[in-house]
């Protein structure tokens, strides 16, 4: 493959301005990540440690093989929500390595409101199980939770994707032959008791872990019986009497050793084999991305300059280079794995939509993972393009994305607006993982456009009533709309609500994509049942 010839002048003032803006954005990201990784308030953390319990991230460090990467999911879930009571939504999830195989972990943080479940905690737990299901990853649940956070109970209990979905997923995962292991390291109360009960194997820590459907206060209220936590559902009860738990651990460290032994004895399935080459660093420094990407998502730049800084050797075999030039498509390798890349270089026209559909079908039939680099304002609008069938041609691209059964990974590197989000494999189209850069924006349309549309509607309504607005009044209508769209288009607003799997440092994109591809190969890639339709 040919090496991309970069046209970026790294000594230019524009490059340095872009670089400074991105570094500031990354500093903000790191500060926010550092804060949520502390967990709950200092008082809660101190009390937790005084009880001889390991903090959640210390538990994970001991669980995983030394010097192996941890692909954390949604670390800023719940950010700036719930009056900031739930950093990381009170839970750590992600993909780590235990005895050489990738596992999906879901770990409650008991320093955050006793590990109770907020609505976003449930969404985060369910999303982690979805990742496990799609990629056939064994699940390890480090349980230390008081159940649902009752002030938000209406958003946690009865709906399809609420608390019950966790247990439904466990049953389905087990039926698929995907191991489920629970480690009870603290409270496991009410509905949460089904996590260990529905796991294939369960470990419980003595004098610390408890499992019961109804705790001592509820038992007394219902039956008049007075009983302690340990008498009702401690390790001795469940390992010696009920049989709910299978392994008796002396403390957190012992529980983790037992868990590692369990995973060691799980039959390791053979990964799907891609034709992998020896990994090669990009020819251009990935940190140069900071200076390539302007802080204003409305300002265009060549997506090839980003591709050159994430692919092996900066080599890229472009497909249909001279046709539909507002989308760049082509083949490359990331950490040795073959990938098909689609990146935006402007609005999507009929030609670029058909080109993308053709390329996606090529990758699907060849079983090559797809990487989408989103920087898209949407599909072209206007009389000429509607007459030319942009809706029909855009639908071809959407069909191709939806039906591509190869691993798909999406990175929002700039704007992600409207139907452009759909065509470029947004959350609804099943990417195995989706990340955002800290400069990115995600919205149904730009704030300026939304303000113009809503202001125009208001003006026409008043004109029909014989009234006319001054420009000052029109600006008053537009301002709250602009402010609202600016806030809600933020990557932090998105990631708090799990519209993505995390906001990331652009320089880490390549490594995260490599981890994502490696993870995805635990599942088979099915055969495509039809040929390639040339567009």
Task: Name each model-derived stretch.
Residues 1-535:
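Ligand-binding clefts of soluble mixed alpha/beta catalytic domains
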């Amino acid at each position: 493959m040919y090496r991309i010839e970069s046209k970026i002048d790294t000594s230019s003032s524009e490059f340095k301005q872009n670089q400074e803006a991105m570094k500031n954005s990354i500093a903000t990201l790191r500060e926010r990540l550092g804060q949520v990784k502390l967990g709950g308030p200092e008082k809660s953390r101190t009390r937790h440690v005084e009880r001889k319990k390991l903090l959640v991230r210390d538990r994970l460090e001991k669980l995983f093989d030394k010097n192996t990467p941890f692909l954390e999911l949604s670390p800023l879930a719940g950010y700036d929500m719930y009056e900031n009571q739930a950093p990381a939504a009170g839970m750590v999830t992600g993909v780590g390595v235990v005895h050489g195989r990738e596992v999906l972990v879901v770990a409650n943080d008991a320093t955050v409101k006793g590990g109770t479940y907020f609505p976003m905690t449930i969404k985060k737990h369910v999303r982690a199980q979805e990742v496990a299901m799609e990629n056939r990853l064994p699940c390890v649940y480090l349980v230390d939770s008081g159940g649902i956070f009752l002030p938000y109970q209406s958003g946690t209990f009865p709906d399809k994707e609420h608390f019950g979905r966790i247990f439904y997923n466990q049953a389905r995962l087990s039926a698929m032959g995907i191991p489920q292991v629970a480690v009870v390291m603290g409270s496991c109360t009410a509905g949460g008791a089904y996590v260990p009960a529905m796991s294939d194997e369960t470990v419980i820590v003595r004098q610390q872990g408890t499992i019961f459907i109804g705790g001592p206060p509820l038992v007394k209220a219902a039956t008049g019986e007075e009983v302690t936590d340990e008498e009702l559902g401690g390790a001795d009860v469940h390992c010696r009497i009920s049989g709910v738990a299978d392994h008796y651990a002396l403390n957190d460290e012992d529980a983790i050793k037992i868990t590692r032994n369990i995973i060691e004895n799980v039959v390791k399935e053979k990964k799907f084999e891609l034709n992998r080459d020896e990994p090669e660093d990009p020819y251009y420094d990935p940190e140069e991305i900071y200076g390539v990407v302007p802080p204003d998502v409305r300002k265009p730049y060549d997506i090839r300059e980003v591709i050159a800084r994430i692919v092996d050797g900066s080599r890229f075999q472009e497909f249909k280079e001279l046709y539909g030039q507002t989308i760049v498509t082509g083949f490359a390798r990331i950490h040795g794995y073959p990938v098909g890349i689609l990146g935006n270089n402007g609005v999507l026209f009929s030609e670029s939509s058909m080109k993308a559909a053709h390329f996606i079908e090529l990758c699907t039939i060849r079983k090559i993972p797809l990487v989408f680099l989103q920087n898209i304002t949407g599909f072209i609008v206007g009389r000429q393009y509607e007459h030319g069938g942009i809706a029909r041609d855009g639908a071809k691209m959407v069909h191709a994305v939806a039906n591509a059964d190869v691993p798909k990974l999406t990175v929002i590197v700039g704007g992600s607006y409207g139907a452009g989000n759909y065509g470029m494999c947004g959350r609804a189209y099943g990417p195995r993982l989706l990340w955002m850069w800290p400069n990115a924006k995600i919205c149904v349309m730009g704030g300026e456009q939304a303000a113009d549309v809503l202001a125009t509607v208001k003006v026409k309504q008043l004109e029909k009533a014989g009234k006319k607005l001054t420009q000052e009044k029109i600006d008053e209508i537009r301002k709250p709309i602009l402010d609202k769209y600016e806030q809600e288009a933020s990557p932090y607003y998105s990631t708090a609500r799990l519209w993505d799997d995390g906001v990331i440092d652009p320089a880490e994109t390549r490594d995260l994509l490599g981890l994502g591809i490696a993870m995805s190969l635990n599942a088979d890639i099915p055969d495509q049942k039809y040929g390639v339709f040339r567009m």
